[in-house]
């Protein structure tokens, strides 16, 4: 049974876009790098009997391997139409000044949300805002936008947009002091508030959900249903060795969040299952999953909107190898070793509940790989268990987003062996081959030039439906360029989908001038018939340009006019 707590109305803060971010001092960079070691903390290890069961398929995998990722099409503005089923990138950009080198990390943890042309993306130590649909980004300082609390800001940010209430959520983790820590939930209501940096925020602590002093939240994430926002987190002791004690999910009503008033939070806390991963795509019921620590099962939780009752079903899955993952690349640097088998991606759509997680090498799999379980929403029976694997490289760190059709796609990394860490995108929709019988449909995005010198990567990526074109997706990722240090990590923003769902089809206009006479007064009216080609809906703060030219004798005269809608 869930419990409830009331917290005060939110505070307000004003952020600024910074074309030149302040440089972090060496001491501050060292503090942040050390702080990363305190996040993504592991839970209890599985029982020996569970580990021993991983020999289940030593004769080899029973599902086909996925080949090398295909090369996607990057759609240029105004380009000729492509076949409707063509996978395309509408945006695929480096964050540039939005993620300066002093603020990036090989443990990238990028998250993203968008409200029309305003795109907000975060990583471990940075935040970035685009007001031109992700073409360019400016830096937002997460250290100074809000007042500091507890041990100061670091790491584990999550971003999510709710189109129904026009709210963009920005969840930030503050490190613990001697007593507790804080998850700060900042909200920008409307595109203009997001673009101008106008935020209000609530602070969440472990003590608000009935936990004692000396506990702190780690690894927080966000998801939505029709009428609620959900925050999940793992709870650890502040004192070393940072032992796991609880896992929590909090339910926050969207109407109250929109009204920015005092807030009633419903919450559910457990001490027998580590790490909750809640489903993207939920409507009137949220689901979340957690791996059993003693058997080959996923505990499938469910919580109906408006109900205080949390219930669950234990779903048996196939065993999988769960030793320490390893996937050294050409330079011997191993980017897989920080990962574990907590569930990373979860979705519900079209009567199917799905979960995705990392598994290690072993039991016939030469490299770490991604496990998937699809469950019938009505019967809670397993439908199938696809595997994303290869005999040449590891596949790791999947994220999943659900589009308006209930189809899934998201970023995922590959690499190891002769390949450096590579960012890819997978898609599984009505046009994809069945991964169970034919392997996964994947597309390469960018390949690193090096492996991480610290032998770290992750800890998660993000995928969301694009707003307002919910049949396409936005997603995050990164690569290493020119070296293996934190400063070489380059985050990316991606907007992708099928050509049939391209919200920016070739558009423009043709102009036909009618006959006219140049008057002696020097003022001439030229009747012009404008015929539109394609269509485009302009949202708030959109920018468009009208240009035309004519000849005055042999001199070409140009005019360009720009307008912000």
Residue spans for each PLM region:
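Intrinsically disordered, low-complexity Pro/Gly/Ser/Thr-rich segments with frequent PxxP/GP/PP motifs
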Residues: 557-565
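Short, solvent-exposed loop/turn segments enriched in Ser/Thr/Gly
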Residues: 520-527
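Low-complexity, acidic Ser/Thr/Pro/Gly-rich terminal tails and inter-domain linkers that flank the onset
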Residues: 500-520
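C-terminal PAP-associated
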Residues: 2-501
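Asparagine-centered strand-capping/turn motif at beta-strand->loop junctions
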Residues: 530-537
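Short flexible loop/turn segments that cap and initiate beta-strands
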Residues: 538-545
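Conserved aromatic beta-strand anchor motif in extracellular beta-sandwich/beta-rich domains
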Residues: 546-552
């Amino acid at each position: 049974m869930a419990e409830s707590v009331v917290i005060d109305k939110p505070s307000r803060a004003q952020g600024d876009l910074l074309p030149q971010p302040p440089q972090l001092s060496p001491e501050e960079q060292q503090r942040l790098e050390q702080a990363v070691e305190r996040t993504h903390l592991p839970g209890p290890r599985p029982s020996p009997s569970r580990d021993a069961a991983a020999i289940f398929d030593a004769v080899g995998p029973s599902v086909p391997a996925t080949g090398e990722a295909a090369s996607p099409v990057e759609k240029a503005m105004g380009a000729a139409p492509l076949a409707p089923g063509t996978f395309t990138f509408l945006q695929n950009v480096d964050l540039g000044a939005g993620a300066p080198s002093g603020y990036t990390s090989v443990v990238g943890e990028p998250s993203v949300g968008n409200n029309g042309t305003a795109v907000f993306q975060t990583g471990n130590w940075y935040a970035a805002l685009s007001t031109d649909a992700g073409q360019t980004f400016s830096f937002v300082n997460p250290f100074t936008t809000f007042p500091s609390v507890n041990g100061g800001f670091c790491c584990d940010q999550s971003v999510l947009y709710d189109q129904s209430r026009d709210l963009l959520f920005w969840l930030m983790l503050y490190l613990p002091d001697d007593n507790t820590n804080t998850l700060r939930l900042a909200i920008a209501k409307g595109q203009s508030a997001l673009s101008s940096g106008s935020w209000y925020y609530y602070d969440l602590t472990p003590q608000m959900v009935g936990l004692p002093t000396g506990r702190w939240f780690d690894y927080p994430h966000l998801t939505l249903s029709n009428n609620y926002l959900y925050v999940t987190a793992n709870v650890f002791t502040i004192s070393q060795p940072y032992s796991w004690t609880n896992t929590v999910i909090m339910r926050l009503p969207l109407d109250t969040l929109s009204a920015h008033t005092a807030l009633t939070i419903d919450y559910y806390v457990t001490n027998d299952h580590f790490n909750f991963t809640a489903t993207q795509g939920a409507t009137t019921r949220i689901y979340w999953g957690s791996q059993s620590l003693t058997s080959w099962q996923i505990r499938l939780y469910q919580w109906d909107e408006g109900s205080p009752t949390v219930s669950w079903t234990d779903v048996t899955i196939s065993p999988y190898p769960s030793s320490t993952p390893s996937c050294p690349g050409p330079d011997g640097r191993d980017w897989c070793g920080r990962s574990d088998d907590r569930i990373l991606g979860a979705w519900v759509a079209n009567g199917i509940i799905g979960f995705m997680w990392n598994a290690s090498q072993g039991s016939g799999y030469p490299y770490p790989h991604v496990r998937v379980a699809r469950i019938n929403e009505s019967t809670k029976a397993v439908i199938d268990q696809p595997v994303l694997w290869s005999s040449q490289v590891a596949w790791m760190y999947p994220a999943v987003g659900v589009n308006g059709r209930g189809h899934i796609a998201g970023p995922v990394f590959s690499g190891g062996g002769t390949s450096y860490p590579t960012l890819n995108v997978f898609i599984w929709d009505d046009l994809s081959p069945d991964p169970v019988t034919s392997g996964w449909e994947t597309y390469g995005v960018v390949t690193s030039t090096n492996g991480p010198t610290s032998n770290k990567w992750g800890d998660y990526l993000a995928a969301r439906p694009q707003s307002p074109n919910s049949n396409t997706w936005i997603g995050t990722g990164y690569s290493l360029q020119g070296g293996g240090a934190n400063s070489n990590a380059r985050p990316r923003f991606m907007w992708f989908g099928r050509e049939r769902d391209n919200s920016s089809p070739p558009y423009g206009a043709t102009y036909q001038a009618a006959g006219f006479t140049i008057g002696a007064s020097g003022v001439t009216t030229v009747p012009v018939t404008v015929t539109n080609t394609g269509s485009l809906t302009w949202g708030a703060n959109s920018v468009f340009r009208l240009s035309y030219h004519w000849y005055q004798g042999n001199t070409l005269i140009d005019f360009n006019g720009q307008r912000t809608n």
